[in-house]
Design a protein with these regions (language model features):
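Acidic, low-complexity central loop/insert segments
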Residues: 1-30, 39
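Short flexible coil/turn linkers enriched for glycine and charged/polar residues
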Residues: 2-3, 47-48, 59-62
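Accessory RNA 3′-end/elbow-binding domains used by RNA modification enzymes
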Residues: 9, 24, 39-46, 52-53, ...
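A short secondary-structure junction signal
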Residues: 19-22, 36, 77-82
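Nucleotide/phosphate-binding catalytic cleft detector across ATP-hydrolyzing
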Residues: 30-34, 47
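A generic structural motif
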Residues: 64-68
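Ser/Thr-glycine-rich phosphate-binding loops at phosphate-binding pockets of nucleotides
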Residues: 69-78
Length: 234
C-alpha cells in the first residue's frame, strides 16, 4: 500500500514550550505502535506503523501545524492523542488535509469536478485524447512506487488468464523484494500486467531457472493483448 502525507493542525490542551514540542515530535519518527481509535473501521489490535517524517511547521498559541509522511493505515488523530500523552498536556486533531498518496501529489494531481466536466465535454466535441490525459492518468502511474518484475512477452498472456509467474518468464526485477511482498508485474514496454505476491526474495528469484516465483492476485491487462504462447492441458 502506498505511503501518505498529511498536513495537520493539532490542538494542545495546555501550553508547552516549543523546544519540548519539537523534541517529542522527533521521537515519533520511525516505527511506532498504534491501537486504532474506538471509532474506526478495523479491529482495535495493537500494530506497528512507520512514520517516515514528522516536520514541525509552526505554532500559534496551542495550535500546532505539522507535516507527516506515514505508512498507509496510520491514524493521525491517534498520533495526535499519543503526542499529547507524551507531552503530558493532552492533544487532539483539529484539522487534517491529505497532500499525497503514493506518487499523487496534491499540487500536481488534483482537478475539480468542474474541470472534469469541462474537459470531458471538450473531448466529446473534438475526440482529442490529449484533452483527457490532462486529468486521466495511465494506471501505471499509480504503480510506479511498487517493486517491479519485468517479464518476457511469451509469459504475458498466461498471466492475463490468471496463471502464476514462473522463473523462466522473468527478465529483470527490482532489488529488495521479500517473500510475501506485493509486486507489480510489467511487460518489457512498461505495461502493467498483474499484481502478484512474491513467493521468494529477489536474490533467490535471480538464481532460479524453474518454479513459481510470484502468485497472481489481480490481473490488470485484458486477455489477448499479447499472443498466446502456452498450451492448455488436454
Amino acid at each position: 500500500m502506498a505511503g501518505k502525507e498529511y498536513v495537520c493542525v493539532m490542538k494542545l490542551h495546555s501550553q508547552v514550550p516549543i523546544d519540548r514540542l519539537k523534541k517529542v515530535l522527533q521521537e515519533f519518527q520511525g516505527t511506532i505502535y498504534q491501537r486504532p481509535p474506538v471509532r474506526s473501521s478495523v479491529k482495535r489490535r495493537l500494530r506497528t506503523r512507520t512514520i517516515y517524517y514528522l516536520n514541525f511547521i509552526e505554532m500559534n498559541e496551542r495550535n500546532v501545524l505539522f507535516k507527516v509522511g506515514c505508512e498507509a493505515g496510520t491514524y493521525i488523530r491517534k498520533l495526535c492523542y499519543d503526542i499529547g500523552e507524551v507531552l503530558g498536556c493532552g492533544a487532539h486533531m483539529q484539522e487534517l488535509r491529505r497532500t499525497r498518496v503514493g506518487p499523487f501529489i496534491e499540487d500536481e494531481s488534483l482537478v475539480t469536478l468542474h474541470d472534469i466536466s469541462y474537459l470531458f465535454n471538450q473531448w466529446q466535441l473534438t475526440k482529442d485524447e490529449s484533452i483527457l490525459r490532462k486529468f486521466v492518468y495511465p494506471m501505471e502511474k499509480a504503480l510506479q512506487l511498487m517493486p517491479k518484475i519485468y517479464i518476457r512477452d511469451s509469459a504475458v498472456d498466461a498471466l492475463c488468464h490468471g496463471a502464476h509467474l514462473t522463473a523462466p518468464g522473468v527478465l529483470s526485477l527490482d532489488s529488495g523484494i521479500k517473500i510475501g511482498d506485493t509486486v507489480a508485474v510489467f511487460t518489457q514496454k512498461g505495461e502493467a500486467v498483474t499484481l502478484a505476491k512474491a513467493f521468494v526474495s529477489s536474490e533467490k528469484m535471480l538464481k532460479m531457472d524453474h518454479g513459481f516465483v510470484a502468485k497472481t492476485q489481480r490481473v490488470l491487462m485484458p486477455r489477448g493483448m499479447y499472443p498466446k504462447m502456452w498450451r492448455s492441458k488436454q
